[in-house]
Regions:
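Helix-rich, typically C-terminal accessory recognition domains appended to large enzymatic cores
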Residues: 79, 144-158, 410-441, 496, ...
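Conserved oxyanion/phosphate-binding beta-strand-loop segments in alpha/beta enzyme cores
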Residues: 1-36, 66-75, 99-106, 210, ...
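Amphipathic alpha-helical
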Residues: 195, 200-224, 260-302, 447-479, ...
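Basic, alpha-helical terminal appendages of large translation-related enzymes
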Residues: 1-21, 25-32, 260-263, 272-275, ...
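Residue patterns forming the tRNA-binding/recognition surfaces of aminoacyl-tRNA synthetases
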Residues: 4, 13, 17-21, 91-241, ...
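Alpha-helical recognition segments enriched in aromatics with Gly/Pro capping
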Residues: 306-312, 316-329, 358, 478-613
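Catalytic alpha/beta core of large soluble enzyme barrels
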Residues: 58, 71, 263-362, 367, ...
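N-terminal catalytic cores of NTP/NDP-binding nucleotidyl/phosphoryl-transfer enzymes
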Residues: 27-94, 100, 123-138, 161, ...
Length: 803
């Protein structure tokens, strides 16, 4: 009789053993496999069952790779600088240095409850000066390469977080962190020239084994388009306004022009009659968030009083301002062709601007247009020398024609904008720049890095556009590294993405104080083979990491240019009715009580069983009870048969190979919920076979090895009980034999005139005549008439044609 399954005693025993005798040891002979989780923000609320999901998935995959003979690189660290940590500290009224350390301690305890096989010797923390020395070093290298520069510009401003935001941190016009509507603020900012890498970031997506959804999100964010820039002279001025258009074929239909209110020429285009209205409109637009400006509601605008000249036909084009045009896309100015664009049509109709149709179906002009004609194809009309051409042909040829005329040029445009890298906050890496009145912006010498973040009592954001560091005069005032003259330090800090854009490189050489990563170690252990985390990072972190990796490859630090070979995005675990778990909603399920009551192994398995891992799944506490019962049943099955000297029957051999086949293939396709259902299904089969005469040792040990990545504690205990002195994770992942899986007999239907009358059991490789004879015997007196034709589809069906 098997002793009861005591999860508390068993799990504590094996955690102690793993700590004293690590199971993942680099012997220098095994190939490496680098499996990485997106490292967490050390938030104050700790981990809930939703966080566990990604960590369990990565741990299962990691242990699977160990059993396949790899040396596993599976580290963990802390994304501890930036807004999440600082906002929590402000909320608690405690210095972020203290709250961050406390939160890390708590989350590390919770992560250890998962029994994940993390190598804590590789741990990194983005707030550690030994780490952010290299974050600053990368910035200095980018500065020297011309990729980091200063620019005064209207930036996204979060009035709640009181800091600037990159475009990628604005979701539907709101701050990605706190959800507040984002406004615009003119500030001098540090920028990173990510746009220089736009084509490589786009083209190299083809190299990656990533979800197509993520690749599309990055493709759309980079937003490459082909078109033309067209120069419109301003009437009465020796100036031109350049517009970008993807439809230069419609240039004859441009009846007005719209500039973003932030456009450099917006104010100077105002006449005496319009100046007051123009300045009021510009001010009102500055108070709106981008989401308000782009929402599909009634368009607003103001006429500047000035005109541009259509360079193709000499027509006067009124110049308007409207907040539906954004300064940071294209040139911040658009030519408007209301006959062929819904938004332009709405604007022209509201403000009584002429509408000229230049593309028509079959060349026939629409009288009294009530909506824009937006069909892609048509014949050119009202277009001078272009009349009669097919618009699809002209669209391709027009950029070169415009270029030859000297009124514009063929252009490729990107939605991607340079990365706003400054943050007006305290809790971040100091930007290693000194501002000298003589020399300008000068980088801190590399040998003086890290530039330490000074200790302060007042760390709250100022909201003035200045970082709290600006008040520390003894830190700000310094000397120029170039000329020795009095100078001032840069007081903005880096964004939270600075450290997370390269941290995965540092794990494999985290104690190196001479270089970011030793080249020999980088060549041996990098890049990441499998990266696991939420899809919410598709554009932000994943795009920035690719940019940093390409830059570090360019300067010779590493010899690869993509950080993560394969990516898996797990879905969210939600509370009831699909609502996201959060403390404020009161629907957070803590793993601590579940581990105490059911054990870590039960919780790990339920995290996977709850639904397809790539989809959101609703949590139900009752589900873990069923998983716990399954583990107890297998525990009893294994121990009840442990000492039985049972010889493997053909049926047991077949079941064993099918078990290995099904579990392996489901695991390889990341169908982890069906892996768990497979374990349950085969456990039931083995329990039935056990009643008939027992289960052989090899079949049970095979099951234990397969189960080990999912339920490591119970698997280790059973492996030991079966007489093994080494860890189950030093075993080898079982293989299956297709021949051994074949059924000796299968059931096939027997039909008369296409209608099934009975079934027969046959050998799939049996003789056709014997099978037909067996079929006729089984039918007996059901055959009424003369058999005209006998059909046998091997292994599938018998059909008799009877008349």
């Amino acid at each position: 009789m098997a002793e009861p399954y005591n999860h508390r005693a068993i799990e504590q025993k094996w955690r102690d053993k793993w700590e004293s005798t690590p199971i993942n040891v680099n012997d220098g002979k095994k190939p490496k496999y680098y499996c990485l989780d997106m490292f967490p923000y050390p938030s104050g609320s700790g981990l809930h069952v939703g966080h566990w999901r990604g960590y369990v998935i990565s741990d299962v995959w990691s242990r699977y790779k160990m059993l396949q003979g790899y040396y596993l690189i599976h580290p963990m660290g802390w994304d501890a600088f930036g807004l999440p940590a600082e906002n929590y500290a402000i909320k608690m009224g405690t210095h972020p240095k203290i709250t961050t350390a406390s939160n890390i301690k708590n989350i590390k305890r919770q992560i250890n409850e998962i029994a994940a096989i993390y190598d804590w010797d590789m741990e990194v923390n983005t707030t550690d000066p030994n780490f952010y020395k290299w974050t600053q070093w990368i910035f200095v290298k980018m500065f020297k390469a011309g990729l980091a520069y200063e620019k005064e510009m209207p930036i996204n401003w979060c009035p709640s977080c009181k800091t600037g935001l990159a475009n990628e941190e604005v979701v539907d016009g709101c701050c990605e962190r706190c959800g507040s509507p984002v406004t615009k603020k003119n500030l001098k900012q540090w920028m990173l020239r990510i746009t220089k890498y736009a084509d490589r970031l786009l083209n190299d997506l083809d190299k990656l084994d990533w979800p197509e959804k993520v690749k599309k999100m990055q493709t759309d964010w980079i937003g490459k388009s082909y078109g033309a820039e067209v120069d419109f002279p301003v009437e009465g001025k020796d100036e031109k306004i350049t517009v970008y258009t993807t439809r230069p074929d419609t240039l004859h239909g441009a009846t007005f022009m719209v500039l973003a209110p932030e456009h450099a020429m917006a104010k100077e285009l105002a006449t005496d009659e319009t100046r007051e209205a123009v300045e009021k409109y510009i001010f009102n637009a500055s108070m709106k968030s981008n989401v308000d400006r782009l929402q599909d509601k009634e368009k607003t605008g103001v006429f500047t009083g000035s005109y541009a000249i259509n360079p193709l036909n000499g027509a006067k084009v009124p110049i308007w301002l409207s907040d539906y045009v954004l300064a940071d896309y294209g040139t911040g100015a658009i030519m408007c062709v209301p006959a062929h664009d819904d938004r332009d049509f709405e604007f022209a109709t509201k403000f009584n601007i002429p509408i000229i149709q230049v593309i028509a179906k079959d060349g026939k002009e629409i009288e009294n247009m009530t909506e824009a004609y937006t069909e892609a194809a048509g014949t050119m009309i009202n277009s001078g020398e272009w009349n009669g051409m097919e618009s699809s042909v002209l669209k391709k040829e027009a950029p070169l024609m415009i270029e030859k005329m000297g009124i514009g040029r063929k252009t490729v445009n990107y939605k991607l904008r340079d990365w706003v890298f400054s943050r007006q906050r305290y809790w971040g890496e100091p930007i290693p720049i000194v501002h000298c009145p003589k020399c300008g912006a000068v980088p801190v010498p590399e040998e003086e890095l890290p530039l330490l973040l000074p200790e302060v009592e007042k760390y709250q954001p100022t909201g003035t556009g200045e970082s709290p560091l600006a008040d520390i005069t003894e830190w700000v005032n310094t000397t120029c590294p170039c000329c020795g003259a009095p100078a001032k330090r840069e007081t903005n800090t880096m964004p939270q993405w600075a450290g997370s854009s390269w941290y995965f490189l540092r794990y494999v050489d985290n104690k190196n104080d001479k270089e970011l990563v030793n080249r020999e170690k980088a060549d041996k252990y990098l890049p990441v083979d499998m990266y696991i985390g939420g899809v919410e990072h598709a554009v932000l972190h994943l795009l920035y990491s690719r940019f940093y990796t390409k830059f570090l490859n360019d300067i010779g630090v590493i010899d690869f240019d993509e950080p993560f070979k394969k990516l898996f995005n797990q879905g969210m675990i939600t509370g009831k009715n699909g609502i996201k778990m959060s403390k404020s909603k009161g629907n957070v399920v803590s793993p601590d009580d579940l581990v105490r009551d059911y054990g870590c192994d039960s919780l790990r398995i339920y995290e996977l069983f709850v639904g397809p891992p790539e989809l959101d799944s609703e949590w139900d506490d009752k589900g873990i009870e069923g998983v716990n019962r399954f583990l107890k049943r297998f525990w009893k099955l294994a121990l009840d048969n442990k000492d039985n000297d049972v010889k493997a029957t053909p049926e047991l051999i077949k079941v064993r190979h099918k078990l290995v086949h099904d579990i392996t293939n489901r695991l390889n396709s990341f169908s982890l919920n069906t892996v768990i259902s497979g374990f349950m299904e085969y456990n039931n089969k083995l329990m039935e076979l056990s009643k008939k005469g027992g289960v052989d040792k090899e079949t049970l040990e095979t099951y234990i090895i397969l189960l080990a990545p999912f339920a490591p504690h119970v698997s280790e205990e059973l492996w030991e009980q079966f007489g093994h002195t080494d860890s189950v994770f030093h075993a080898t992942w079982p293989e299956y034999d297709e021949e051994a899986m074949k059924d000796d007999e299968i059931e096939i239907p027997v039909q008369i005139n296409g209608k099934t009358k009975c079934t027969i059991a046959i050998n799939p490789d049996g003789d056709k005549d014997e099978i037909l004879a067996k079929a006729k015997e089984a039918l007996g007196d059901k055959v009424n008439g003369t058999i005209r034709k006998e059909i046998y589809v091997p292994g599938r069906i018998v059909n008799l044609v009877v008349k």
